[in-house]
Regions:
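Bacterial N-terminal signal peptides
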Residues: 4-13
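Short, solvent-exposed loop/turn elements at domain surfaces
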Residues: 44-48, 86-88
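GT-A fold catalytic core of metal-dependent nucleotide-sugar glycosyltransferases
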Residues: 61-85, 89
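Metal-dependent phosphodiesterase/phospholipase catalytic core, i.e.
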Residues: 20-25, 34, 80-191, 213-234, ...
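Catalytic domains of carbohydrate-active enzymes, especially glycoside hydrolases
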Residues: 53-70, 209-218
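Active-site beta-loop-alpha junctions enriched in small/polar residues
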Residues: 41, 69-73, 81-82, 149-151, ...
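C-terminal active-site rim and adjoining tail of enzyme catalytic domains
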Residues: 20-24, 117-123, 193-194, 198-294
């Protein structure tokens, strides 16, 4: 019954919402506290998931994302792909088909994960996450998103315990988020999702039944086309209102977009945070948007 009521309520909001919401990020979040997630480290600015990429993201004033996997001998590292085909284009086919999980740390640590993007980046390596935690401990104001690919959460919680308050665990798996919060209650979380408005409505209804427990931030993937946005403006306005009523930061990922006007339009709709492959463009668009209020 509660789920049906929520679906009806969100549906009504989507149908009737016309004007932009009265709530605007500029009135509630100082620009210095605006959270931008740099996808896979620094987006397109650097080879992904490297210490160098994370450094660029922090220099821009954003929060880098690390994708976590575990080597054959149990070392948690930052690496996104299921295999090495994209990152090691010059390697032999047998090597390209392998996964992080098939190699030991000694085998992983010598891989050049930067050369595929150009000789300027040659020599960059897969980072061990314990090294990243040491960097975070030295810079208490820095934060890091950690997206779980293949990791034992108990091991992750144990190894990162000194910097739990600087971590934001990101996952599309709600049960995993709840498990992590039991292990690391000081850590923030981000629940990300994409799909049609119907699919998103159903997922939000399910979270509503759980009172959005253990979720700090929620991210919706937004795709732009000639016909408008998917999901649409009215849906995003209604979703933002729902999330704010539960104290959850509303983040959008403008999928593969580097259009400053799209970032600014999403802020008009009540979006209060971004994930992006173009963190430099996003930060400039945000600065310009905040300056419009002066």
């Amino acid at each position: 019954m509660k789920e049906s009521a929520f679906l009806l309520g969100l549906s009504l909001c989507v149908v009737t919402a016309g004007d932009p919401p009265k709530w605007n990020v500029r009135d509630h979040i100082p620009i210095e506290q605006f959270t931008v997630q740099s996808h896979r480290g620094a987006g397109v600015l650097s080879p992904e998931n490297s210490i160098e990429a994370f450094g660029i993201a922090w220099q821009l004033g954003t929060v880098p994302e690390a994708d976590l996997r575990t080597t054959k001998d149990g070392v948690i590292v930052a690496f996104h792909d299921n295999d090495f085909k994209r990152i090691l284009p010059a390697a032999d086919p047998a090597m390209q088909s392998k996964r992080i999980e098939d190699l030991t740390w000694d085998e992983v640590r010598v891989l050049d994960i930067g050369a595929w993007k150009g000789q300027t980046f040659a020599g960059q390596r897969v980072p061990m996450m314990t090294d990243m935690y040491r960097i975070l401990a030295q810079h208490p104001k820095r934060r890091l998103y950690i997206d779980i690919k293949n990791v034992d959460l108990v091991q992750l919680a144990r190894e990162s315990r000194k910097v739990h308050n600087q971590l934001i665990l990101a996952s599309t798996d709600y049960d995993l988020i709840c498990e992590w919060k039991r292990l690391a209650p000081r850590s923030a979380t981000l629940h990300w999702m994409g799909g049609t408005e119907e699919q998103l409505t159903a997922r939000l209804a399910s979270l509503r039944k759980a009172n959005f427990a253990d979720i700090t931030q929620l991210q919706i993937h937004v795709r732009a086309a000639q016909g408008g946005l998917t999901p649409g403006d009215k849906f995003l306005i209604a979703a933002g209102e729902q999330l704010r009523s539960h104290g959850i930061l509303f983040q959008a990922l403008p999928w593969m977009s580097k259009d400053p006007k799209l970032f600014q339009h999403l802020m008009d709709l009540g979006v209060a945070s971004f994930a992006t492959d173009y963190p430099d463009i996003a930060m400039q668009a945000i600065r310009e948007y905040y300056n419009l209020k002066k």
